[in-house]
Structure formats: C-alpha cells, structure tokens
Amino acid sequence: MMSVRQLLDRKGRELFSIAPEAAVLEAIRIMADRHVGALLVMEGDAVSGIVSERDYARKVILMGRSSADTPVRDIMSAPVVTVQPETTVEKCMQLMTERRVRHLPVTEAGRVVGMVSIGDLVKAVIAEQQQQIEQLESYIHS
C-alpha cells in the first residue's frame, strides 16, 4: 500500500493556510482561487485548526452569520488529526472515516509538510488498482 510520502511526491506539497483572526470571507476566496476545499489555520508555524467549505456552510451560512465579520477562529475545526509521511493511504482512509474528516495535515519533525484530502486518497487507490489490473493482464497474456 502506498505511503503518504509517496502520495505527496506525486501530487506536490503545496500548502495553503490562513491566520485564525482572518475573516471567513478571505478564507473562502483563497479556497476558490486555489481550487481547494480546506485551509490550514496557522499561528506562526503551529497548526491551530482546519477551515473547510463544510465549516463555512454549517457554521456561517446555516447560522445566518456574516462571512466578512466572522473570524476563521470561530468556525475552524480543532484539534486537528494529523498523519506522518510513513502513514499508509489505507490508514489515512480509516482515520478519515473514524474521525469524519476530509483533510489530514502531514507532519514530520513537528512541521507541517503537506496535506492530503479524501480525493487525493481515492485517486491514489484507483491508480494503484489500475496498475495491478495492468500487471495481471500482462501476466495473463504472456
């Protein structure tokens, strides 16, 4: 099974973050501009939470709050569940299911080195299965 390190090597390690005191509107703009569903909420080098489109929908829109006047701190999900580069894709999927989260920051030596989403994991599993199918077909035809 593929490790998170291998997945990050393929997809890239670009991180998008926001400060806890920033307005939710700014977070939504960054997510839209970067085509991502969540941002790390960072205080310096420390992760204080994650803010996602789901947090926005449930904690701003449904509550009738203003995205321009609400700080990210008020809607972020915390504490954050993290994984290490050695964690398997399978273990990440298990954690996401158990904790009902869609994004996992990846930490190494106390630093955030990437983030994986449920979409990243599904793509990795599909690619791995496709490779296995191709190997089996090659074996059968040889």
Feature map (PLM): residue ranges:
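Tandem CBS (Bateman) regulatory domains
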Residues: M1-R13, S52-T82, T88-T97, I118-S142
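A positional/architectural concept
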Residues: M2-S48
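Secondary-structure boundary/capping motif
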Residues: F16, S48, G114, A124-V125
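The conserved cystathionine-beta-synthase
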Residues: S17-H35, T82-R100, T107
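Short, charge-rich amphipathic segments
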Residues: A22-D33, L62-D74, G110-R111
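A glycine-centered beta-loop-beta connector
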Residues: M31-R34, L39-D55, M96, L104-G119
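Short, surface-exposed, polar/charged, turn-prone segments marking secondary-structure boundaries
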Residues: H35, G44-A46, S67-T70, S77-P79, ...
